[in-house]
């Protein structure tokens, strides 16, 4: 009997290992909705965690694993802007300043308006603890205040530092900062949506079966979004704010981008697209998608409807629309690949 069971166990273990490896390999075959096409436009990006079009021919890339921020030109030639960074997750810029989110630290540089003469490194915030997660996106609100996403140090715990598991406001000039929203376990990114507000992704706890859903939330100043008290029996604790859109549990919804009016991709002026990285915390593969979320303000509330737009895309993290409306995203596995989605001609 045992000699018959042993091969079966071996096959099952092999399949489980293959399932874990597959999304990080180069063997996936991305598919996208009818009427659109997807293609790889650059490889060997490193560990890409941010994408931002500086202009129509200059793409900014954060390489977390390489500790650098660089640009790609129209021919995908690389120019390093800033190096020797500690796991840079994101950057934001104005006409005179560049803000960089590193592990537990937010820094500012000056530049000449064209991403040249980058100098005068200044530490705005430091000492934010890192652990299971780290500080992620840095964005600029319409009023000029910086919003900095700070992940939790654990899966489920009460943080010693209130700056973990939170969204922070930061004064871009002085570095003074505080808690803008709490109870946010690990928010990778957010985006301002006109007529809606600032929306942000959040990755929920692991090891709780089909709880909780991946979330898209609407920022309310001073709001609490439930973690770590949001257990399966009480998913939206009293006094906390529930999500405006959800997706498959444990699939890690991360980067988010607002669809521009000139985009050929489906949606309206309050549609966002998000990356779904996928998870090791499931038996069968889930995630590895690009999803579309249509936001509809109704009677003072905002409701989001989520649907799949692209599948089997590997491990996508950052996402951005080109000025011409095409959609770009990068996968973190396979040493970093850049994809473009556009309408079929």
Kindly give the residue locations of the regions a language model identified.
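Secretory targeting signatures
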Residues: 1-23
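Asp-box/WD-like beta-propeller blade repeats and closely related beta-sheet repeat scaffolds
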Residues: 104-141, 149-152
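Beta-propeller domain segments
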Residues: 21-32, 135, 152-157, 162-179, ...
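Beta-rich, blade/repeat-based domains predominating
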Residues: 44-58, 84-103, 128-146, 182-197, ...
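Beta-propeller domains
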Residues: 59-75
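A short beta-strand motif characteristic of beta-propeller blades
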Residues: 37-43, 77-83, 122-128, 175-181, ...
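Mature N-terminal segment immediately following signal peptide/propeptide cleavage
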Residues: 29-53
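Residue-level marker for isolated small/hydroxyl-bearing positions within beta-strands
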Residues: 54, 62, 101-103, 149-151, ...
């Amino acid at each position: 009997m045992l000699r018959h069971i042993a091969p079966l166990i071996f096959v099952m273990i092999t399949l489980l290992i293959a399932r874990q490896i597959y999304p990080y390999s180069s063997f996936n075959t991305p598919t996208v909705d009818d009427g659109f096409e997807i293609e790889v436009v650059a490889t060997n990006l490193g560990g890409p965690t941010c994408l931002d079009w500086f202009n129509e021919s200059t793409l900014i890339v954060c390489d977390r694993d390489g500790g650098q921020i660089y640009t790609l030109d129209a021919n995908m030639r690389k120019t390093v802007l800033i190096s020797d960074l500690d796991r840079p997750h994101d950057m934001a810029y104005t006409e005179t300043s560049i803000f960089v989110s590193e592990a537990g630290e937010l820094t500012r540089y000056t530049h000449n308006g064209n991403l040249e003469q980058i100098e005068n490194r200044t530490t705005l915030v430091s000492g934010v603890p890192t652990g299971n997660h780290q500080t992620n996106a840095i964005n600029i609100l319409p009023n000029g205040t910086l919003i900095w996403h700070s992940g939790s140090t654990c899966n489920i715990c009460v943080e010693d530092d209130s700056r973990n598991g939170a969204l922070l406001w930061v004064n871009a000039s002085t570095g003074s900062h505080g808690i803008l929203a709490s109870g946010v376990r690990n928010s990778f990114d957010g985006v301002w949506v006109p007529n809606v507000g600032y929306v942000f992704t959040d990755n929920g706890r692991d090891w709780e079966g089909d709880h909780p859903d991946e979330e898209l939330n609407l920022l309310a100043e001073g709001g609490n979004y439930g973690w770590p008290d949001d257990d399966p029996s009480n998913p939206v604790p009293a006094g906390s704010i529930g999500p405006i859109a959800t997706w498959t549990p444990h699939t890690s919804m991360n980067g988010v981008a607002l669809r521009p009016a000139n985009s050929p991709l489906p949606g309206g002026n309050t549609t966002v697209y998000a990356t779904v990285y996928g998870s090791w915390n499931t038996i069968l593969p889930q995630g590895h998608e690009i999803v579309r979320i249509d936001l509809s303000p109704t009677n003072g509330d905002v409701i989001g409807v989520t649907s799949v737009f692209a599948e089997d895309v590997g491990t996508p993290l950052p996402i951005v629309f080109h000025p011409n409306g095409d959609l770009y995203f990068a996968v973190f596995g396979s040493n970093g690949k850049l994809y473009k989605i556009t309408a079929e001609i």
